[in-house]
């Protein structure tokens, strides 16, 4: 993964995991990613997420290593490789539990995630110009001076900010 746009990398990893119908995935950590995941969890797009620091990382690594050795499934080896790769320096892995609306068909709660504000073109919106996503059925994730929130919360609090992504 590139370090040019870590948020876009996280969104791509989530979309790829949904297409593979995985139950969870690992991404490298950052404070902004954690705030975005809080919003996604609160809005019901993901089940949960957890930061794997210290003992939690050791337990998860041990469990994945055992599963990778026992299972012929290549997914387990991929998960183990991601865990090792993302636990470097001050970073730690984040485990994201995906949410599926229909367990049999594996229909995801996330239809699509689109990164709006990018490195070369930042997109800002005021209270009056805050975008509606899919006529109110989706959300816009907005970074304001009061923190990362949805477009609905930003309108309610009368805050503008950088539009990070659209999710529906």
Swiss-Prot record:
Q: Might you report a single GO cellular component term? A: cytosolic small ribosomal subunit
Oligomer and partners: Part of the 30S ribosomal subunit. Contacts proteins S5 and S12.
Q: What is this protein called?
A: Small ribosomal subunit protein uS8
- Keyword Ribosomal protein in the entry? The reply is yes
One GO biological process term is: translation
Keywords from the named record:
Ribonucleoprotein, Ribosomal protein, RNA-binding, rRNA-binding
Q: Which SUPFAM superfamilies match?
A: Ribosomal protein S8 (SSF56047)
Provide the function of this protein: One of the primary rRNA binding proteins, it binds directly to 16S rRNA central domain where it helps coordinate assembly of the platform of the 30S subunit.
The UniProt family comment states: Belongs to the universal ribosomal protein uS8 family.
In terms of HAMAP family, this protein maps to: Ribosomal_uS8_B
Q: List the disulfide bonds.
A: none
- One example GO MF annotation: structural constituent of ribosome
What is the superkingdom listed in this entry's lineage?
Bacteria
Q: Per its UniProt record, what Gene3D superfamilies does this chain match?
A: 3.30.1370.30, 3.30.1490.10
Region annotated Not found in other S8 sequences sits at: 59-93
> Native species of this protein?
Aquifex aeolicus (strain VF5)
């Amino acid at each position: 993964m590139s370090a040019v746009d870590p948020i876009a990398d996280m969104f791509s990893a989530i979309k790829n995991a949904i297409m593979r119908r995985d139950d969870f995935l690992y991404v490298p950590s950052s404070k902004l990613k954690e705030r975005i995941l809080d919003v996604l969890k609160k809005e019901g797009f993901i089940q949960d997420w957890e930061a794997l620091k210290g003992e939690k990382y050791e337990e998860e690594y041990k469990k994945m290593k055992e599963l990778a050795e026992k299972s012929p499934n290549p997914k387990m080896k991929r998960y183990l490789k991601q865990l090792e790769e993302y636990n470097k320096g001050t970073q730690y892995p984040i485990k994201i539990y995906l949410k599926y609306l229909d367990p049999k068909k594996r229909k995801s709660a996330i239809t699509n995630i689109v990164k709006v504000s990018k490195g070369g073109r930042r997109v800002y919106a005021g209270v009056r110009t805050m975008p509606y996503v899919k006529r109110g059925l989706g959300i816009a994730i907005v970074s304001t001076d009061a923190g990362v929130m949805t477009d609905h919360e930003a309108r309610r609090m009368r805050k503008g900010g950088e539009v990070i992504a659209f999710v529906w």
